[in-house]
Amino acid sequence: MQKFGSLLFPAALKEKSAGKKIAFIALFTAFSAVTNMFLEVKLFDLQFSLTVFVSVFTGVFLGPVFGFCACFLGDLVGYFVNSWGQLYFFWVGLSTGLTAFISGVVTAFKTEKKGAIYAKIAIICVLHLFVCTIAVNSTGFYLYNKAMGFSKPLLDYVAERFGGNADFFAYLCYRLFFKGQIINSAFNYALLFDAVPLLSLN
């Protein structure tokens, strides 16, 4: 029961009153929404932003459950306020929420080992890449593009490098490497290694 409580509310929030907990959740939801509205550039299935960094920070501070809720709602609110004229893709919000959830779970386990925080950050980055970027976001956009019809640049890229078969692996390579989504992820990961140790989460 105590372990569950630490997952629900991390040490920074556990002793706060219910009112302060609600205020912090609302604050991080607004922070996530502002990030989605003003600190990102969306180009259909690509997104260049600080969303990963903000979502990790939110999950660390609020814990996995409320971190997920704050980031998912923040993404939804951000879309309604500033949609960039695009459709709402629910898997983007799901991915954002999962980033916070993963971060909250990983950092909930305390250890006194030297350098443990760097190991935690590395685990968060790897899980984000495979769970959020690949399994959720890229899969969602691949299925959407497949249903709506792949773009000519994508088909040309696939034809040149994979012989014309636009399967998931080919689309993933196109999205991550040709269009540069991996650069955005790497930039956010670098920020995490730079900034998160300041939170003293060992």
Task: Give residue ranges: language-model regions.
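Loop-helix junctions at membrane interfaces
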Residues: 1-202
